[in-house]
């Protein structure tokens, strides 16, 4: 695994899409997978990142504004002839879904009409690991297991989706029974 971070310059036009296509083509000759993390939004950084892509993983949260943005991104990907698009739903909170305060993964999939490749629960361990510079993949956390499962699915393995309700403690579930509206 090699990681090449993006440049942190103010000038996002220092590399154009044709240069990205050339660079990605060169990298594809050397690696099995070349994964580009797109910046949020649809500006030049996004256009550069998708220039050489043959597949996309759209990551969204189950919030109305995020789903609208994801839908816009999907349209742009399709307009740029990227048709292998999968969906990752991030920061899911089963307790909020049960209360009706958050869309379910099924609702998000219905709205965006993409195959689901990953469900990542909201997990404070993500913040802790990020701040400590530690990876979560391979860790004994719900999010770490979810990331590992996404990796397996990208590789073509059939892996069942985790039951996110199991990640909620017994007392939280009991409490939820008595706090229904």
For the regions a protein language model found, what residue spans apply to each?
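P-loop/Walker-type NTP enzyme "switch/lid" segment
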Residues: 1-29, 128-132, 136-137
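Conserved catalytic-core segment of NTP-binding enzymes
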Residues: 18, 22, 26-29, 33-128
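NTP-binding/hydrolysis catalytic cores, primarily Walker-type P-loop NTPases
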Residues: 132-181
